[in-house]
Amino acid sequence: MVCLKTLSVFLAAFAAADARAVFKTQSSNKADIIPDSYIVVMKNGVSHDDFKAHVSSVSQIHSNNKAKRGTNTNGMQREFDIMNWRGYHGHFDPDTLDEILNDSKVDYVEHDQIVRISGLVTQRSAPSWGLGRVSHRQAGIRDYVFDDSAGRGVTIYGVDTGIDINHQDFRGRARWGTNTADRDNADRHGHGTHTASTFAGTTYGIAKNANIVAVKVLGSDGSGSTSGIIAGINFCVQDAQSRGILGKAAMNLSLGGGFSQANNDAVTRAQNAGIFVAVAAGNDNKDARNYSPASAPAVCTVASSTVNDSKSSFSNYGSIVDIYAPGSDIIAARPGGGSTTMSGTSMASPHVAGMGAYMIGMGIDPRQVCDRLKQISLPAIRSPGPSTTNRLLYNGSGQ
């Protein structure tokens, strides 16, 4: 009996240890970690009711700990539910965090971290060349040749610094979505308006007839948080679902930060739900596998090319990159009217988002778009980087 009792105690202890959630550590710069700010992801199969009960319990635990210890953490901030992928973000003290990790319904927890735009230098009045390049087999031709459907009936979510939805380049096709960054719905930076103009502008865009939704997740300085981005993605999926446009939607994420499993899981759920997701590879001239959401295998990760079909000097690279697209010296709209020129993988990604909408409008399933774009792409990029594709975005115009 003693042996059996000892064994049962051992097994109980083992089960308890096994039930503890994983605390995932990121490979990013520790300076980008937001203190006491955490993203909690539930295990697959946790029901809506169990999730709500867990959230309520954590809120009560945090409140009790705050009262006892006088901590200044803010507790629960926002919840996520992306096609039954459930989680939340909050500011918690160490004792509350420990309780969360010991809950058997929790899959993993990670630090929230700063995420930034993937754009670089602004050069005014520079020539535009990207549209011509993606519609011709040879470089140097400025005419843009495209099917006149141009994304008609497809909606593109611009997850960025906001969008000037009244800009003349959008001709009334843009609407406001949500803001998870701050209390100012304007695009004070210009990055989001520029990328939206690239994926769906009437003058500067690929999918000239697509609808546009502004999803602000980054502030006027071009930075935000992983939790804010996940909240933005959560909005996109729920909005598309409520409007019946899953399968007729795309999303552009011209942003990135250090590796985040939660960020990768969120974009993967969006992609699997029926939204084509294009993301910037990043601008550090390093392997994109260490960045999120660029490292998510399910999405279309885009590196940046120059007018001479070379890898942009700043562009990240690596086997996770799906395709190259024009990203150096790209002219597009700026808030308040007019245009400006920017460089970065931020400028490459919306070329692919727009082309994805273009393909969806022609009947291709969003979950097959990235593979289709790779199939018709051109083997044009010189010195693409270690273990990196040399394929350049092309719309298959035959030119």
Swiss-Prot record:
<feature type="signal peptide">
    <location>
        <begin position="1"/>
        <end position="19"/>
    </location>
</feature>
<dbReference type="Pfam" id="PF05922">
    <property type="entry name" value="Inhibitor_I9"/>
</dbReference>
<dbReference type="Pfam" id="PF00082">
    <property type="entry name" value="Peptidase_S8"/>
</dbReference>
<dbReference type="InterPro" id="IPR023828">
    <property type="entry name" value="Peptidase_S8_Ser-AS"/>
</dbReference>
<feature type="domain" description="Inhibitor I9">
    <location>
        <begin position="37"/>
        <end position="117"/>
    </location>
</feature>
<feature type="active site" description="Charge relay system">
    <location>
        <position position="346"/>
    </location>
</feature>
<keyword id="KW-0645">Protease</keyword>
<keyword id="KW-0865">Zymogen</keyword>
<feature type="glycosylation site" description="N-linked (GlcNAc...) asparagine">
    <location>
        <position position="395"/>
    </location>
</feature>
<keyword id="KW-0720">Serine protease</keyword>
<dbReference type="InterPro" id="IPR037045">
    <property type="entry name" value="S8pro/Inhibitor_I9_sf"/>
</dbReference>
<keyword id="KW-0964">Secreted</keyword>
<feature type="glycosylation site" description="N-linked (GlcNAc...) asparagine">
    <location>
        <position position="252"/>
    </location>
</feature>
<protein>
    <recommendedName>
        <fullName>Subtilisin-like protease 4</fullName>
        <ecNumber>3.4.21.-</ecNumber>
    </recommendedName>
</protein>
<dbReference type="InterPro" id="IPR000209">
    <property type="entry name" value="Peptidase_S8/S53_dom"/>
</dbReference>
<feature type="active site" description="Charge relay system">
    <location>
        <position position="160"/>
    </location>
</feature>
<dbReference type="GO" id="GO:0006508">
    <property type="term" value="P:proteolysis"/>
</dbReference>
<dbReference type="InterPro" id="IPR034193">
    <property type="entry name" value="PCSK9_ProteinaseK-like"/>
</dbReference>
<comment type="similarity">
    <text>Belongs to the peptidase S8 family.</text>
</comment>
<comment type="function">
    <text>Secreted subtilisin-like serine protease with keratinolytic activity that contributes to pathogenicity.</text>
</comment>
<feature type="glycosylation site" description="N-linked (GlcNAc...) asparagine">
    <location>
        <position position="308"/>
    </location>
</feature>
<dbReference type="InterPro" id="IPR015500">
    <property type="entry name" value="Peptidase_S8_subtilisin-rel"/>
</dbReference>
<keyword id="KW-0325">Glycoprotein</keyword>
<feature type="propeptide">
    <location>
        <begin position="20"/>
        <end position="118"/>
    </location>
</feature>
<keyword id="KW-0843">Virulence</keyword>
<keyword id="KW-0378">Hydrolase</keyword>
<keyword id="KW-0732">Signal</keyword>
<dbReference type="InterPro" id="IPR036852">
    <property type="entry name" value="Peptidase_S8/S53_dom_sf"/>
</dbReference>
<dbReference type="InterPro" id="IPR010259">
    <property type="entry name" value="S8pro/Inhibitor_I9"/>
</dbReference>
<feature type="active site" description="Charge relay system">
    <location>
        <position position="191"/>
    </location>
</feature>
<dbReference type="InterPro" id="IPR050131">
    <property type="entry name" value="Peptidase_S8_subtilisin-like"/>
</dbReference>
<feature type="domain" description="Peptidase S8">
    <location>
        <begin position="128"/>
        <end position="399"/>
    </location>
</feature>
<dbReference type="GO" id="GO:0004252">
    <property type="term" value="F:serine-type endopeptidase activity"/>
</dbReference>
<dbReference type="GO" id="GO:0005576">
    <property type="term" value="C:extracellular region"/>
</dbReference>
